[in-house]
Amino acid sequence: MKRNILLLFTFFACITVQGQTPVRLVDLRSEHLDRPIGLDNPVPRLSWRMEDGRQGAVQTSWRIVVDEDSLNVVNGCGRMWDSGKNDSRNQLVAYAGKKLQPFTRYYWKVICSDMEYKETASPVSYFETGMMGMQHWQGAWIGDGKDIHYGPAPYFRKEFKTGKKVKSARAYIAAAGLYELYINGEKIGDHCLAPLY
């Protein structure tokens, strides 16, 4: 008898714990990618998943905020786009805010309501735009003047000084073969002979 009571108590405790599992918004993606860089779509698609273990769980609304400042997004402010509340179950939405600028990081989050109309906010994610058109190209192509069938691999070196402390930098590399990048004599990244782009 005591065993049956203990089993019954354990069963109801498990159901109670399962019912208290918080709703979470996860798997935030831009163009189906996790925190991508170099997006060239002026209208990227943003998606997410709602994790809610309750029976009959459903998303009843969503609101997306996008901004260049992550703190604004944390506070629910989107100067680039605030979709406003949309009564919809959609979890894939096309960006519909101000025109995105090239080479810019945009932070975003989604706020959704569950089946009880309680709101849950996602963690902040981001996407970075790429060149977004040849008119923004400022780089100069470098090469050894040989075609791709020439045997020895070229080695390119460029010395320069920034004149100030570098907070972050990005190198865009397109190679007809493999490459490794070094800065100040130190290899960048943990890959070995990265392919093409």
Residue ranges and their predicted role:
Residues 160-163, 167-183:
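Aromatic-lined ligand-binding clefts that engage carbohydrates, nucleic acids, or primary amines
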Residues 46, 61-64, 179-181:
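Short beta-strand elements bearing conserved aromatic residues within extracellular beta-rich modules
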Residues 1-24:
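Bacterial Sec-dependent N-terminal signal peptides
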Residues 20-55, 126-133:
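Pro/Thr/Ser/Gly-rich low-complexity, intrinsically disordered linker/stalk tracts
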Residues 129-151:
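Low-complexity, Pro/Ser/Thr- and charge-rich linker/hinge segments at domain boundaries
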Residues 95-99, 183-197:
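Beta-strand-rich ligand-recognition modules
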Residues 50, 57-105, 111, 115-122, ...:
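Recognizes extended acidic, P/S/T-rich segments that occur
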Residues 45, 105-109, 168-170:
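Short, conserved beta-strand segments of beta-strand-rich sandwich/propeller modules, principally
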